[in-house]
Design a protein with these regions (language model features):
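N-terminal periplasmic/intermembrane-space "pro-region" immediately following the signal or transit peptide
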Residues: 4, 20-23, 39, 43-137, ...
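Short loop/turn motifs that connect adjacent beta-strands in outer-membrane beta-barrel proteins
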Residues: 97-109, 121-122, 150-163, 211-234, ...
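Hydrophobic, lipid-facing positions within transmembrane beta-strands of outer-membrane proteins
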Residues: 107, 141-147, 200-206, 235, ...
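Transmembrane beta-barrel strands of outer-membrane/channel proteins
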Residues: 113-119, 165-169, 237-241, 298-302, ...
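Residue-level signature of outer-membrane beta-barrel architecture
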Residues: 151-155, 208-210, 241, 288-291, ...
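Surface-exposed coil loops of outer-membrane beta-barrel proteins
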Residues: 180-196, 200, 215-325, 465-476
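Outer-membrane beta-barrel "beta-signal"
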Residues: 203-215, 447, 516-528
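Outer membrane beta-barrel transmembrane domains
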Residues: 327, 343-384, 405, 412, ...
Length: 528
């Protein structure tokens, strides 16, 4: 059996003056970037903005048919039912974009920019490895900008067609290069910082609706669905380049890192290893049936050639991700909104198994053949290997201002984590509260707790020094990774939002020998 020597790493000491100088410089850059984004986010003239005040659009509402996660791309929904408790006449709803979007247009042009500054204090660490969340003080800034464009070619209510094309740029870096945590602290961070910030095509989709009835229901037009009304019963098809969380595992209080929580395993189900490249996108198709109170959707999409890879495997016979979801819009409380979703996934890809990697390392065969000194799962990858799992997702309004939500996720855990993050089981509970009580109806407070876990084979792999695409401390004293996150999102003006956020991470990377860690964040967001 191979032996390992783990060198204790003391908590680094830093020159306070030097840290303050670097922090001030970084904050100055952040202010400059925010100012530039504000100038870029004013496509309408002053006259257009003044005229928009005379005829404000209706406040966006949670869609009765939430097949499209509009909240993820186009800002938050103001609740019209959040009446002022003082009994005064209702005020016009606030505008939540730099310029309003006409509901009857066949074109859609909008955008968003998101800047997140994160800093971490030093924390206890008995040792570090290649993929550790570093224990020294650190701060990083990430930037994401997206241009949403779409055209509605067939304006028939029963047979609507949308063509969607989005461009995106992601820059900056995450703390510790986004390594060392299963629930990383910033969803905007690209897991391969070497890709750079060059703009890329994020989405190209064809969206087709086939109505099954003449009866319609209204919906808020957005960048992924332009029709202001759709048939109550309908079939929808999408084909092209997408990101799966736009359509699956959507959750009103917990899906948007730009206006809500920032942690990977709070905004998405951490155990859902959904098909995606490093940036979070894939190519494929999906179908969806919608009725008044329920929906069912299914899609098949391309998988990457390697774990966390940017290149996709186009041989669908051996590599693909299948996803299905049932959604029931049934509230537990009268006159309040409530939704429950059941998700399943089954991925086939060039994956290895943790147990095989550990066994061949311990018996010396991998060391003799390949010269490796730790278990190496990539040496045991098999084409067509199957990884599967399921998820539960719920949200419920308790009052006009208060919503609670939760998730549970599980996957079989024998095959390597491949596309999203290294979680085999997750449990989440949280809530958000609108600021109507203090006359800030679009402001919001959020609080959530998520606890992530991995299976025994995965634990052993990390214990003997193996590396995943995110984790690897060189050793593992296993414990559940538990994260508490809280934020306040402040609506400054029109489409400008600022947020303060704090996260507490217990057992980072499932390691009881490290942590706990605190991460603070400041976020600037613009919708235009």
């Amino acid at each position: 059996m191979a032996a390992f020597i783990l060198t204790p790493i003391p908590t680094p000491r830093h020159d306070g003056k030097d840290m303050l100088i670097r922090l001030a410089a970084d904050q100055k850059k952040l202010r400059i970037l925010t100012g530039c984004l504000l100038l870029a986010a004013l496509p309408a003239s002053w006259a257009q903005i003044r005229s928009a005040d005379a005829a404000l659009p209706e406040a966006p509402q949670p869609a009765p048919i939430p097949a499209i996660a509009l909240i993820r791309a186009n800002g938050i929904a103001a609740h019209p039912e959040d009446a002022d408790p003082s009994g005064r006449e209702p005020q016009d709803p606030p505008i939540v974009a730099m310029a309003p979007h006409p509901e009857d247009s066949i074109y859609w042009i909008s955008g968003q920019a998101n800047i997140i500054f994160q800093g971490r204090l030093p924390f206890h660490s008995a040792y570090e490895g290649t993929n550790s969340f570093r224990n020294s003080a650190e701060y990083k800034t990430s930037m994401v900008g997206t241009l949403f464009t779409a055209i509605r070619r067939n304006r028939s209510i029963r047979y609507n067609t949308d063509f969607i094309f989005d461009l995106e740029s992601a820059g900056g870096r995450g703390l510790s290069e986004a390594l060392g945590l299963a629930g990383f602290t910033n969803l905007d961070v690209v897991r391969n910082p070497n890709l750079g910030s060059t703009p890329y095509i994020a989405r190209y989709e064809i969206h087709q609706i086939f109505g099954l009835t003449q009866k319609t229901v209204s919906q808020d037009p957005g960048p992924f669905a332009l029709a202001p009304s759709v048939p109550v019963r309908r079939i929808e098809f999408r084909i092209g380049k997408v990101t799966l969380p736009d359509f699956f595992d959507v959750n009103g209080p917990g899906s948007d890192s730009h206006l809500q929580f920032m942690n990977w395993t709070i905004d998405n189900n951490g155990a859902w290893d959904y098909a995606a490249d490093t940036r979070g996108y894939t190519v494929g198709g999906m179908a969806e049936y919608d009725d008044r109170a329920w929906s069912v959707r299914y899609g098949i999409f391309a998988m990457p050639t390697v774990a966390n890879g940017i290149d996709m495997d186009w041989a669908f016979s051996r590599a693909h991700g299948q996803n299905g979801e049932f959604e029931l819009r049934q509230s537990l409380i009268r006159d309040r909104k409530g939704v429950t979703r059941l998700l399943f996934f089954a991925n086939r890809a060039h994956m290895g198994t943790y147990r095989e990697a550990v066994e061949d390392f311990l018996n010396g065969s991998d060391t003799a053949t390949y010269g490796v000194t730790v278990p190496t799962i990539t040496l045991h990858a098999h084409f067509g290997a199957l990884k599967y799992g399921f998820g539960y997702n719920t949200e419920q309004e308790l009052t006009p201002n208060l919503r609670v939500f939760g998730r549970f996720g599980w996957n079989e855990g024998q095959h390597e984590s491949y596309a999203y993050t290294e979680v085999d089981q997750t449990v989440l509970a949280g809530a958000d509260y609108y600021g109507t009580r203090w006359h800030r109806p679009v402001d919001k407070i959020g609080l959530a707790v998520v606890s992530n876990a991995i299976k025994r084979d995965h634990q052993n792999y990390l214990h003997y020094g193996g590396l995943g695409f995110l984790l690897g401390d060189g050793n593992l004293n296993y414990g559940r990774e538990t994260i508490v996150e809280s934020y306040y999102n402040w609506h400054a003006w029109r489409g400008m939002f600022y947020a303060l956020d704090v996260q507490h991470i217990d057992n980072p990377g499932y390691n009881r020998d490290r942590g706990a860690a605190w991460v603070g964040s400041v976020r600037a967001h613009i919708d235009f």
